[in-house]
From Swiss-Prot:
Its main location: cytoplasm. One of the proteins required for the normal export of preproteins out of the cell cytoplasm. It is a molecular chaperone that binds to a subset of precursor proteins, maintaining them in a translocation-competent state. It also specifically binds to its receptor SecA. The keyword Glycosyltransferase does not apply. It is found in: Cytoplasm. One of its GO terms (cellular component) is cytoplasm. GO terms for biological process: protein folding; protein tetramerization; protein transport. Homotetramer, a dimer of dimers. One homotetramer interacts with 1 SecA dimer. This is Protein-export protein SecB. SUPFAM superfamilies: SecB-like. Belongs to the SecB family. Keywords: Chaperone, Cytoplasm, Protein transport, Translocation, Transport. NCBIfam families: PRK05751.1-1 (NF004390), PRK05751.1-4 (NF004393), secB (TIGR00809).
Length: 153
C-alpha cells in the first residue's frame, strides 16, 4: 500500500438543521377563490463553507414560487443546512461531495419542510420531484470551464 492510500476516506453527518424558513401568501384570501391552476417555479442553490479542518457546513436553498397569472399565490423559501465531517478527499472529489452529495442528503428534509409549509397555508399538496444534484453539479463544472452543458436524453 502506498503512502497516498494511507489517508482513509471518511464521511460523517454531524447535524442537519433548518437554517431559515419563509412562507408568504401575499394574495390570500383572494387567491383561494380562484380555480387552482398555478405555475410552480423551483429554484435551487447550494453554498458551503469550511468551519474547521475537515468540517464543512453545506446550505441548500430551495425557493418555490406558485403564480396564477400575474399574482403570486405563495412563495416558500427554505435553507436546509448540514454540518459534515469529510476526510481523505480533496480537489474535484471534495467539490462534488460538497456540491452534489451533501445537497442530495439535505433535499428530502427541505422538501418535507416546504410540503408542510404549503399545507399550513391551506394550499393543495405540493410534491417536489427528486433533484439530480450530480447532473446539476456537472452542468456547473461545464459552465465554469466555459463549455456548453450537454443535454442527456
Amino acid at each position: 500500500m502506498s503512502e497516498q492510500n494511507n489517508t482513509e476516506m471518511s464521511f460523517q453527518i454531524q447535524r442537519i438543521y433548518t437554517k431559515d424558513i419563509s412562507f408568504e401568501a401575499p394574495n390570500a384570501p383572494a387567491v383561494f377563490q380562484k380555480e387552482w391552476q398555478p405555475e410552480v417555479k423551483l429554484d435551487l442553490d447550494t453554498a458551503s463553507n469550511q468551519l474547521a479542518d475537515g468540517v464543512f457546513e453545506v446550505v441548500l436553498r430551495v425557493t418555490v414560487t406558485a403564480t396564477m397569472g400575474e399574482e403570486t399565490a405563495f412563495l416558500c423559501e427554505v435553507q436546509q443546512a448540514g454540518i459534515f465531517t469529510i476526510a481523505g478527499i480533496d480537489g474535484t472529489q471534495m467539490a462534488h461531495c460538497l456540491g452534489a452529495y451533501c445537497p442530495n442528503i439535505l433535499f428530502p428534509y427541505a422538501r418535507e419542510c416546504i410540503t408542510n409549509l404549503v399545507a399550513r397555508g391551506t394550499f393543495p399538496q405540493l410534491n417536489l420531484a427528486p433533484v439530480n444534484f450530480d447532473a446539476l453539479f456537472m452542468s456547473y463544472l461545464q459552465q465554469q470551464a466555459g463549455e456548453e452543458p450537454t443535454q442527456e436524453a
